[in-house]
Amino acid sequence: MKIAIVGTGYVGLVTGTCFSEMGIDVTCVDVQESKIENLKKGVIPIYEPGLEDMVHRNYTAGRLKFTTDLEECLDDVEVVFSAVGTPPDEDGSADLKYVLEVARTIGRNMNKYVLVVTKSTVPVGTAQKVKSTIQKELDERNIQIEFDVASNPEFLKEGD
């Protein structure tokens, strides 16, 4: 199985690394080129016990890859986890702009079935918004491709 994790912050990097540790091929995607280049060099931006060794081991083994280009890996993966930030909006609600941008990118570039899993902590109803956003992009491309959307929000306490 091959998966992509969009977002290499605490949730995305730990999730992707743990999947790769289980033998799954993982591509971690982030828009910050410097972050991706640092990860390729073994510079881990967060602290979690054992994470640095796991990243190194799985990157060296080829099970863990890093890129800034989600489009390039969509044809190879079966599952895309969206673990992007949801900063508070002016009214305190979760700002979904990054979550929906991931959905737009998937809809604009997917060519086969994919399961989209939202890991970001988001309000009820977000899965339907993600599904509608992807479907709108597919409709604009005038193609029909099956896909599913699931929610697997992360609630955690970051390491000390």
Residue positions per predicted region:
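Glycine/serine-rich loop-strand microenvironments at binding/catalytic pocket rims
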Residues: Y10, G16-G23, T27, T68-T86, ...
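Rossmann-like NAD(P)(H) cofactor-binding subdomain of soluble oxidoreductases
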Residues: P88-F155
